[in-house]
Amino acid sequence: MKKELEELNGFKDLRIVDNFYQTSSFFPMPTTEIGTLSESGLTNLGSYSLCFPYYIAGKDYYAMILCCRNSSNTAKNILRTGKCTINFITDKRKYFKEAVRLGYPGETTEEKMKDCIFNLVDGKRARENPNEQYPKIIQEAFQVFECTWVRELDGAENDKVQDEYLPPYHQFNGITSQFGAHFLSLIHIS
């Protein structure tokens, strides 16, 4: 009876799989590529939908919050450098296919970025500060935020890359659980 109702109403039963929010879910979420710097200085791209406005008014700055696994390349690179870019990509099929590929965990930056289809270029911060290193931005993106992690909030300034994270955890910034991290990042707008 349930199957008949689903077919009658036009719905289909989908199997939930890893990265369900990118592969099986259809609520409107942006697809972003978070650019960070690997230990070797290469730009690493990781696919994320869990990136939201945080400070939008009433402050001297604006900020986004990124939710991710604390074992991801993205989290480790932000913990080390405090820098990231949020690259909003368009809905072209080839870009979504690349986002799925780049979102798969477990590869080194060198392995993952070897066949990347996006053109990476220097952003405004790199051009304005040539003596400092920043993650490159995606030329094909329709919008890019260049960000700096606000380490000082919630006492996260002492968070470092580790193999395992034990309590206590922070409430909203830095390492927030055994497997999770949230990064409150200042958007550089000029």
Regions found by a protein language model. Give the residues of each.
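Active-site-proximal mixed secondary-structure blocks
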Residues: M1-S47, F52-S190
